[in-house]
Amino acid sequence: MIDLYTWPTPNGRKVSIALEEMGLAYRCHAVDLQAQDQFHPDFLAISPNNKIPAIVDQKTGQSLMESGAILIYLADTCGQFWGDDRYTTLQWLMWQMGGLGPMLGQVHYFKKYNAGKSVYAEERFFNEALRLYKILDQRLAETEYLSGSYSIADMAVWPWVSRFEWQGVNLKDFLNVQRWYEAIAARPAVQKGYDQPMYMNDIPKV
């Protein structure tokens, strides 16, 4: 049994989607970010960086923070979802962790939550988001999924793309991304994992 500590954010949804896809037994514990549950000492003992998601694998005693590390652990645990090549999968997972996620997070911060406070920041991060979407679209013109077959790299990237409306991005401008996004959105495990630890909103449609 795996205990998952999470909230309905892109990073949180990565792991709940992975657990559903892998069919691993888990219990979901809501960490309410608005109530600042992430600063509770019990949670900090698992995730010292006070960020969700985090897991505790009751079978092995392993606790982990950082969504990318958790995805790698889960893929190794179940022996699935490494795509056609482990290192290609890791490459795109790191691209998400180091580039796509942080940059789209800045778009959310400036464009959605603080619109008008810094035109420079809004434009800078929006343009970077478009650059990253172009890279993603080019990759998905070459292959069905990021690593050939469906993998943890797709599970990491997809929840961030699912907030395209927050980013002001039109997926119809990126037809390969749109095809990939809609295919993943139709997966039953993704639909179930998206609503953990609770329903927040429908999966956005293009």
Where are these regions (language model features)?
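Short, solvent-exposed turn/loop segments enriched in Gly/Ser/Thr/Pro and often Arg
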Residues: D32, I152, P197-M198
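Short secondary-structure capping/turn micro-motifs that flank functional sites
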Residues: A35-Q36, W180, M200-N201
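Terminal-tail/helix-coil boundary detector
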Residues: V190-V206
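GST-like domain detector, emphasizing the conserved glutathione-binding G-site
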Residues: M1-L130, D137
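Phosphate-coordinating loops and pocket residues in cytosolic domains that bind phosphorylated ligands
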Residues: A45, A186, D195
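A local structural micro-motif
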Residues: R27, W82, G148, K172, ...
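GST-like fold's C-terminal all-alpha helical module
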Residues: L74, Q96-P188
